[in-house]
Amino acid sequence: MDKKSARIRRATRARRKLKELGATRLVVHRTPRHIYAQVIAPNGSEVLVAASTVEKAITEQLKYTGNKDAAAAVGKAVAERALEKGIKVVSFDRSGFQYHGRVQALADAAREAGLQF
């Protein structure tokens, strides 16, 4: 089993558990150059809010898009957008990535901006 398939297996197991809970989830995806965050409806069929380092509004404030500062900016942006739509409580779906580095920076920034998870 290679690294990617192990991550996908971990993500599938976590998503199955989150689906049982029926909670709105904050999903994170990480690539070497960018980080993406989406708030997805409990049924899994609708993206309610999204933010990423690909967006021009976020990228203009950053020097580089693949570091912890960029992840924190995305976390803050997705939390602010979720709060505008009335979403206050989410479940954190790290997509099988370790809760460390950029994933942790995004989560901490989202919590500081007012999201609860």
From Swiss-Prot:
CDD domains per record: Ribosomal_L18_L5e
Keywords: Ribonucleoprotein, Ribosomal protein, RNA-binding, rRNA-binding
TM stretches of this protein: none
UniProt GO BP: translation
Gene Ontology terms for molecular function: 5S rRNA binding; structural constituent of ribosome
Gene Ontology cellular component list: cytosolic large ribosomal subunit
Listed InterPro entries: Ribosomal_uL18_bac-type, Ribosomal_uL18_bac/euk
Keyword Hydrolase applies: no
Highest taxon above the source species: Bacteria
Family annotation (NCBIfam families): L18_bact
Assembly description: Part of the 50S ribosomal subunit; part of the 5S rRNA/L5/L18/L25 subcomplex. Contacts the 5S and 23S rRNAs.
Family statement: Belongs to the universal ribosomal protein uL18 family.
Role summary: This is one of the proteins that bind and probably mediate the attachment of the 5S RNA into the large ribosomal subunit, where it forms part of the central protuberance.
Protein name per UniProt: Large ribosomal subunit protein uL18
Protein source organism: Enterobacter sp. (strain 638)
Lineage: Bacteria, Pseudomonadati, Pseudomonadota, Gammaproteobacteria, Enterobacterales
